[in-house]
């Protein structure tokens, strides 16, 4: 019974007779009666899943005023993965949004017992994250810096301090650790039951032993659910079905892709130590040893994330409740050995049980939330990557905000279901990817690491040709993109194995590519960019785009407009360039990972008009970016047409012949601020055009380049990218893009009212460029992204992206500056004067480096100074 007390089944047994009904109108109904009650025929919201996520969503929706909610659980409440959760609540995460979710969960669970009267076993133990290597310690220092600035106490401690906090630990191989004192342990099942109880008291109806068969959809909108006990009409459906979320999504009349897959997850339970551990004993995370350790009733609970995980398929009839899977001591042996090395005194301790339970993982190790791009009203919260307890409270809150208000209070793009496409939902892909993901939970992740499984899923027609020329690849939205090109004299194996927080081994390679972009001409394959065409029989396309986009698109044919697709709050839902092909046709180019999100937003807001056509043409065109001053010479020679600015001005688009190929869309822009052209080539001509470009370009010093060079070029020019620097909570006025907004273009557009108000009231954050002056790129840790920014010693924001500028010979960071009141912490208006008068530091893993803040690209400042000098010289000669 000790095992089941740990997992809080006793909590269900000690509950009042009304627990199995949960309807606030029938609190005295017995469990048997509850299961036999008829379901309601309609509701506003139906939630599938009675675990930590489903009950959290129900709890928060009811707190926000929605009462007509039905929660369905196919077995018993909290009897799925929630029941087997190890009960560790940890706030130490790499992503800020995950840190905030876990912090909210911690505070929520702390007060649940007082709110509901249900004991949750909440005990504040703190956590200690061990480092056996200097790189691991650097990683912890980066996390520590991020935790501190959002108000989560943590500190880097010595091995000696570790031994003082946990006397059973062997610390001889440690170089340091991170202590997070407010982390906790809790009974996850009891937390779920407490959330359900509170939701029930707020009017939520909860029915167990009721299976959802499929979701009913009409014209792309949720209309109801079919259960084994009848139908319920509803406006919203929330899939919180855990490991069954994938299959439930595919069972719909209009399938919803939810890419997740389950693996077996092991942990052991021991009997109490001779001197039982105190309940406040800190939880230990030894990621280098691949294990976690927590106190459990005076003994030990310890599991981990092994290098060779065992994926589980979920075809066939679903189990109503998850059972303990078969023990596998041979498989667990490496984790057990690691545990005994860390805590040698456990050698003689009696082990009670080896628990084997399923955990779901996603292709990128981040949970899945949000509305389906295919079905309006279909929301998902699943794929918690063994962090369901830590994220459950915060994730449930954000999803509830999404449903009630139309968007969450934080930027959750990194967790949005729409970051995936159907291509990531292949069961074979998921099986292979989760076998990589599960070990990565504790692997050391240095900047710019890449997944190794599920690769070469989407490729340019030039992939083999570029690969043969030394391309090293990264993956974005399933698309292979070149990082850089390895010269023949470089050690390829050494480059592939090079992982560091310091100066990377590819530094010189990218320097050569950047230099070529500035002095000669380079080619970058950018075929992964999202491409849409919007056409109409009349003026419908222009009218719709004028309403959806902030800039004025009523421009002459052939002109390109940089613009944004904004939400009601004025934030960027999409950042793109649009070329007017003719009076009734437009060509739209967006970031790679915007493909699903942008399509869903357009379809949601475009009228149902048979005279209006939206087409995804991403796959139809190969995109080559010709960057550099000699790009004009290459293209002139290949097209036999003048390409000088007089004949081909900036931000202009024209269909041309290049080599033997016709119909090439040539655009005078490069996404870098450097001169050059984008070529959008029908895929059947791609190889020919590339070969011709490289052949003719030889005399002009042409070479291939990759996205690392592009990143360096665009950051030093202060070019912000959507998803990295700006998001749906960023307005054009906050990132210096007022010129891309036409408030007086003659018609209303989404977000206009919010921008007018912001223009009057001022902005509360501002995207700023930072140049590190006292930073030694050869010896010091590099900035990558997410580093805290300090102004006059006070925290004001974080970096969003960073790169080494080979022109300035300095690191350049982009990031948002806020103006927090020193007295109240409230945000105040940020002005140019506020930014310019501050002295700044960037915190890189606990070390602060002085930085100069700029609101405009340095190149522009140099140009302005040169023009001023020229004017002064002219005036002098005039005198």
From Swiss-Prot:
The protein's name: Pyruvate dehydrogenase phosphatase regulatory subunit, mitochondrial
Q: Gene Ontology terms, cellular component aspect?
A: cytoplasm; mitochondrial matrix; mitochondrion; pyruvate dehydrogenase (lipoamide) phosphatase complex
Subcellular location, record wording: Mitochondrion matrix
Q: Where is the transit peptide?
A: 1-27
What role does it play? Decreases the sensitivity of PDP1 to magnesium ions, and this inhibition is reversed by the polyamine spermine.
Keyword tRNA processing present in the record's keywords: the answer is no
Mainly localized where? Answer: mitochondrion
Q: Which UniProt keywords apply?
A: Mitochondrion, Transit peptide
Query: Which species is the source of this protein?
Result: Homo sapiens
Subunit relationships:
Heterodimer of a catalytic (PDP1) and a regulatory (PDPR) subunit.
The family database entries (SUPFAM superfamilies) matched by this protein are listed as:
Aminomethyltransferase beta-barrel domain (SSF101790), FAD-linked reductases, C-terminal domain (SSF54373), FAD/NAD(P)-binding domain (SSF51905), Folate-binding domain (SSF103025)
Q: What family is this?
A: Belongs to the GcvT family.
Q: Which gene encodes it?
A: PDPR
The reply to whether Mitochondrion figures as a keyword in the UniProt entry is yes
């Amino acid at each position: 019974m000790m095992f089941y007390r740990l997992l809080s089944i006793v909590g269900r047994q000690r509950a009042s007779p009304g627990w199995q009904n949960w309807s606030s109108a029938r609190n005295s109904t017995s469990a048997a009666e509850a299961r036999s009650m008829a379901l309601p025929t309609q509701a506003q919201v139906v939630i599938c899943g009675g675990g930590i996520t489903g009950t959290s969503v129900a709890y928060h929706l009811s707190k926000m005023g929605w009462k007509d909610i039905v929660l369905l659980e196919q077995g018993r409440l909290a009897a799925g993965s929630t029941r087997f959760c190890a009960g560790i609540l940890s706030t130490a995460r790499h992503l800020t949004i995950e840190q905030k979710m876990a912090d909210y969960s911690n505070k929520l669970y702390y007060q649940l017992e007082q709110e509901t009267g249900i004991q949750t076993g909440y005990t504040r133990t703190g956590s200690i994250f061990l480092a056996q290597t200097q790189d691991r310690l650097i990683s912890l220092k980066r996390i520590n810096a991020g935790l501190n600035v959002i108000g989560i106490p943590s500190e880097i401690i010595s091995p000696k301090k570790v031994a003082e906090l946990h006397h059973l630990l062997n610390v001889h191989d440690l170089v340091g650790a991170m202590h997070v004192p407010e982390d906790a342990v809790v009974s996850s099942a009891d937390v779920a039951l407490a959330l359900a109880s509170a939701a029930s008291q707020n009017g939520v109806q909860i029915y167990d032993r009721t299976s959802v068969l499929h979701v009913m959809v009409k014209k792309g909108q949720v209309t109801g659910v079919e259960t084994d006990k009848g139908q319920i009409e509803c406006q919203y459906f929330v899939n919180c079905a855990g490991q069954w979320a994938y299959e439930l999504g595919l069972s719909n009349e209009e399938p919803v892709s939810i890419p997740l897959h389950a693996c077996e997850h092991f942990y052991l339970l021991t009997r109490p130590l001779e001197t039982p551990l105190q309940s406040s004993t800190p939880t230990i995370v030894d990621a280098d040893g691949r294990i976690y350790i927590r106190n459990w009733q005076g003994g030990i609970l310890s599991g981990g994330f092994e290098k060779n995980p065992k994926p589980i398929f979920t075809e066939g009839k679903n189990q109503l409740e998850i059972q303990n899977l078969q023990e596998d001591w041979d498989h667990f042996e490496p984790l057990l050995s690691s545990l005994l090395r860390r805590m040698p005194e456990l050698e003689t301790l009696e082990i009670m049980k080896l628990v084997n339970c399923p955990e779901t993982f996603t292709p990128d190790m981040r949970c899945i939330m949000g509305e389906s791009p295919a079905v309006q009203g279909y929301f998902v919260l699943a794929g918690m990557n063994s962090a369901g307890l830590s994220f459950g409270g915060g994730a449930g809150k954000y999803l509830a905000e999404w449903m009630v208000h139309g968007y969450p209070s934080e930027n959750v793009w990194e967790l949005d279901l729409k970051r995936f496409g159907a291509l990531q939902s292949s069961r074979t892909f998921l099986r292979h990817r989760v076998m990589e993901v599960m070990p990565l939970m504790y692997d050391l992740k240095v900047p710019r690491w890449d997944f190794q499984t599920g690769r070469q899923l989407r490729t340019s027609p030039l992939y083999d040709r570029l690969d043969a020329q030394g391309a090293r690849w990264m993956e974005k939205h399933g698309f292979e993109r070149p990082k850089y090109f390895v010269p023949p004299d470089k050690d390829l194996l050494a480059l592939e194995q090079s992982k560091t927080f310091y100066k990377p081994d590819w530094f010189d390679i990218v320097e050569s590519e950047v230099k070529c972009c500035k002095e000669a001409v380079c080619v970058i394959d950018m075929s992964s960019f999202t491409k849409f065409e919007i056409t109409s029989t009349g003026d419908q396309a222009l009218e719709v785009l004028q309403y959806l986009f902030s800039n004025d698109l009523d421009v002459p044919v052939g002109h390109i407009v940089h613009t944004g697709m904004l939400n009601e709050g004025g934030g960027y839902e999409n950042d793109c360039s649009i070329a007017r092909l003719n009076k009734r046709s437009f060509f739209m180019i967006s970031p790679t990972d915007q493909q699903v999100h942008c399509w869903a937003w357009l379809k949601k807001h475009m009228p149902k008009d048979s005279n209006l056509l939206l087409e995804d043409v991403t796959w139809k065109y190969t995109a080559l970016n010709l960057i550099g001053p000699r790009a004009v010479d290459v293209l002139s020679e290949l097209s036999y047409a003048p390409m000088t600015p007089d004949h081909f001005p900036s931000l202009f688009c024209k269909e041309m012949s290049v080599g033997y190929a016709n119909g090439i869309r040539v655009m005078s822009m490069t996404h870098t601020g450097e001169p050059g052209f984008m070529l959008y080539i029908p895929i059947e001509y791609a190889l020919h055009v590339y070969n011709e470009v490289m052949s003719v370009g030889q005399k002009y010093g042409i070479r291939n380049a990759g996205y690392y060079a592009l990143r360096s070029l665009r950051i030093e020019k202060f070019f912000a990218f959507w998803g990295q620097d700006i998001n749906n909570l960023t307005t054009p006025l906050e990132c210096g893009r007022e010129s891309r907004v036409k408030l007086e273009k003659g018609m209303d557009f989404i977000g206009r009212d919010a921008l007018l108000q912001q223009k009057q009231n001022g902005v509360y954050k501002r995207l700023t460029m930072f140049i590190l002056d006292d930073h030694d790129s050869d010896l010091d840790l590099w900035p990558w992204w997410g580093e805290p920014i300090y102004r006059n010693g006070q925290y004001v924001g974080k970096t969003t992206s960073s790169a080494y500028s080979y022109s300035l010979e300095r690191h350049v960071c982009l990031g948002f500056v806020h103006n927090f009141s020193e007295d109240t912490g409230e945000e105040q208006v940020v002005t140019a004067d506020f930014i310019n008068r501050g002295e700044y530091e960037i915190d890189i893993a606990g070390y602060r480096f002085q930085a100069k803040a700029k609101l405009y690209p340095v190149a522009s400042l140099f140009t302005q100074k040169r023009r001023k000098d020229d004017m002064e010289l002219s005036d002098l000669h005039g005198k």
